[in-house]
Amino acid sequence: MAVLTPAEVRDVNVRYHDGAAAGYDAKWSIDFDPLARAQIRRKLESALGEPPPRFEHALELGAGTGYVSLNLMLEGLVTRTTASDISAGMLDALARNAERLELDVQTLVADAEELPLPDASFDLVIGHAILHHLPDPARALAECHRVLRPGGTVVFAGEPSRIGDRLAAFPKRAARASAPLWRRAIGAGPDDNRSPASGHDLEGLVDIRVFGAAELAALARAAGFDDVAVRGRELLANWFGWYSRGLECSAAPAQIPWAWRRFAARGYLALAQLDQRLFEGRLPADLFYNLSVCGRRP
């Protein structure tokens, strides 16, 4: 990973996510249908280790286009949401999604390490795949503690584990090797039209860290949280996901058949459910690609 200053990390994240916003939902198969809502419910339940309660007011950090916060509202788990992101482009996409879904969401362009929000304002602070983008995750967790009401819950999910990230290199390499044959099989050409405005050239710079389970737990405790728990999620699903995503990223997006995208999405979800039944809670958290951490403000 390239070594960047904190200011450079923030600048790269803004430019990458602003550029990627328009095609982000299509690239990552983000949806707001019943299947997606159930998936987000499972992610939250997995992170908490129990069925989630209903939260009155939630803050999402790194909200992106609304995959987590909007699905939580649609699922009836959150009443009010403030969606925060450093990227105005992502929040514009989120606002369009919210309008289409007839959801009322407040958006806020802000740095997760310095939130322009009053103390003790939220019942839930949640983030998905954001801590590994931040120059100072400890500072962000301290801000989460500050803006949570006493008894409030913090949840971060989708953070890459050190071991899981190494294991993911194998399906990524396999995808690169087999991509030409796969493209011929589905009748798609290579993706030769990635413009600099899309932010694709910056994608390798925005992921600046991986975590160990003990490290994540220590960060949350140091921020002042009680009842801290770190859990691992997705083993087989992760390997399948990185392989299928690697194939898709090699092809012109408009030429990838809908049937393939549906197969990839359903395959990922089926393996995620298998992981949940067979492996999660039984194997060490560090073996999984995705780590979650949760805690409670005293």
Each PLM stretch: what is its role?
Residues A217-A218, V228-P298:
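A C-terminal cap/extension of S-adenosyl-L-methionine-dependent methyltransferases
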